[in-house]
Regions:
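Structural and coupling elements of P-loop NTPases
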Residues: 1-215
């Protein structure tokens, strides 16, 4: 590509778009959302170099986050990657190689489209939509539904194991950590010999976990 540019002094738009799509070329843009600088250039670059994805007709979704709303209801965040998800649809993790005792089937109770803290309930979410779903208790981040592969493999693995030292009831700490483990399965919370153990990336994650537990 560089040789072609040196020879002709120009590059075909199609070649640049193809390289961006294949993650071989990374455009670098500058701007400030606060000052509304460079926003139009960013949108134009997205229009030119990020062609719309063609989604399959069969339903598929990838869970990427678990959180809780102000009332404590569990929110399972997912991106629909095929077909459409409708309120009251029955979702399952069933695969040919999934042990029967690990199979779950649950109803997507409510579909929410969030904007900050506010949300709008919708009846359906087409492919390409990011939606928060209530009613699911066992879906975890990284899990695929429908035509998606069962799990995405994390790029990083925690290598530090921490044993909690607390004067409080360890069972209460375990319960709180189990809720946080739903949001981040890599915590790998375990209970052994009366002690709670978690796996973390380092001091920064340790501080974040401590703050979340205090909250």
């Amino acid at each position: 590509l560089l040789e072609r540019y040196l020879e002709t002094g120009e590059l075909a738009e199609e070649d640049l778009t193809d390289l961006v799509r294949r993650r071989k070329l990374f455009p670098c843009l500058f701007g400030s959302a606060l000052k509304l600088e460079g926003v139009e250039a960013l949108l134009e670059a997205l229009r030119r170099h990020a062609p719309l994805r063609a989604y399959p007709a069969a339903f598929g979704a990838r869970v990427f986050k678990v959180s809780r709303d102000a009332r404590g209801a569990r929110l399972t965040w997912m991106k629909v990657t095929g077909g459409a998800l409708r309120a009251k649809d029955l979702l399952t993790n069933r695969r040919p190689d999934t042990p029967e005792e690990e199979v779950w089937e649950e109803k997507a109770d409510q579909l929410r489209l969030y904007s900050g803290e506010k949300f709008q309930p919708v009846d359906s979410a087409p492919a390409g939509t990011v939606v928060a779903v209530t009613g699911l208790s066992r879906a975890l981040p990284g899990q695929g539904l429908g035509h998606e592969t069962a799990w995405t493999v994390p790029a990083l693995e925690p290598v530090l194991a921490y044993q909690m030292q607390t004067e409080a009831d360890p069972s209460a700490a375990l319960k709180a950590l189990r809720l946080l483990e739903e949001e981040d399965p890599q915590l790998r919370v375990s209970w052994a010999a009366g002690a709670v153990r978690v796996q973390l990336m380092g001091e920064v994650q340790t501080e974040i976990l401590q703050r979340r537990l205090r909250e």
